[in-house]
């Protein structure tokens, strides 16, 4: 079923975003990654999330975290990446976060890449005054010095 044995993942995140109506978000997690096919990966794990809104109200949530990531090679220098994340709370599955990220990568040469990204984020119980769903577009220019 899998190309390789599952691998262990450890991850952490610290972010601040007053535009999304939260002061900070901290998370730490552990999980397993499965290589289903060469370009298809999935993961599942547990994470502890701590959020603080702009009024300094904090919320700690233990969540299941899961994702699927697929990479589609369109041309030799054009790749489409698709990632989907689902993170329900362990105490209440109706408290969940879901994220979808789609990205075209245009490799100009071995060092330079232009990426066009679309993302959407849904939080069933967002911090006070925040919206439940957000969407965004981004253009990213990357240069690899190696």
Predicted regions and their residues:
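Residue-level signature of outer-membrane beta-barrel architecture
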Residues: 1, 14, 34-36, 40, ...
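Gram-negative (and chloroplast) outer-membrane scaffold detector with strong preference
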Residues: 2-49
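Repeated loop/turn-to-beta-strand initiation elements of outer-membrane beta-barrel proteins
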Residues: 2-8, 38-42, 72-80, 106-116
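Membrane-embedded beta-strand positions of outer-membrane beta-barrel proteins
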Residues: 10-12, 30, 42-44, 66, ...
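Transmembrane beta-strands of outer-membrane beta-barrel pores
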Residues: 12-18, 46-52, 86-90, 120-124, ...
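Residues that define the transmembrane beta-barrel architecture of outer-membrane proteins
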Residues: 24-28, 58-64, 94-98, 133-137
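Histidine/lysine/aspartate-rich catalytic loop segments that bind and position anionic ligands
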Residues: 42-77
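Outer-membrane beta-barrel "beta-signal"
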Residues: 104-107, 133-146
């Amino acid at each position: 079923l899998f190309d390789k044995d599952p691998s262990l993942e450890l991850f952490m995140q610290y972010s601040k975003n007053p535009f999304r109506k939260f002061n900070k978000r901290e998370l730490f997690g552990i999980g397993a990654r499965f290589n289903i096919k060469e370009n298809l990966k999935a993961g599942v794990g547990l994470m502890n999330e701590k959020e603080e809104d702009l009024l300094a109200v904090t919320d700690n949530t233990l969540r299941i975290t899961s994702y699927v990531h697929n990479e589609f090679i369109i041309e030799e220098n054009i790749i489409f990446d698709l990632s989907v994340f689902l993170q329900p709370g362990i105490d209440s599955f109706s408290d969940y976060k879901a994220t979808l990220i789609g990205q075209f990568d245009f490799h100009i040469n071995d060092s330079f890449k232009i990426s066009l990204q679309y993302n959407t984020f849904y939080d069933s119980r967002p911090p006070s005054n925040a919206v439940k769903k957000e969407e965004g577009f981004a253009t990213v220019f990357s240069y690899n010095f190696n």
